[in-house]
Amino acid sequence: MVLVANRFGLRAALDGTSGTVTEFLEQLVGETIDAHAHRHDMIAARNANGLGVEDGELLLYRAATLRGRTSGKPYVYAESVIVVSRLPMGFGNQLETSTVPIGRILEEMRVTVSRHAIGEPDGVPRPNRDMKVSDYLVARTYRLESQQTPVMIITEWFLKTLTPFFSPA
């Protein structure tokens, strides 16, 4: 179980965890978490992309909501840019065809990753049915690396639906 008193405690707990966001959420809310994709598109990389890929290389852009399997409540909205060519064969297909979150797929495929904070998101999330701009408590952007090679950049918005799981200080 994870104890979080408020949004500042949520940020501190997230920054201090070494596990996946999915594991953290499951401990916080007490239910299994599934990923529901809104977008799953191939895009061309731009210069200075933070992933160390050439301009024009194809990357996977994915937008998804992490939801409670039982409650159906949205807890996190995330946008990811992924270098699929640097991940095991089948990663992109599993991501596209299942509700398994990214972190769990990486664990199942035995891909060890490290998280490197990039900072706050550059802007607001794209409009979607699960979230409005004012509906989040904490936002962050980080890069995942495997064997010191960047494999993806993820921006997450932790939604106000997490507030009922805060414990009294």
Please identify what each model-predicted range represents:
Residues M1-T141, E145-A169:
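N-terminal domain-onset segments
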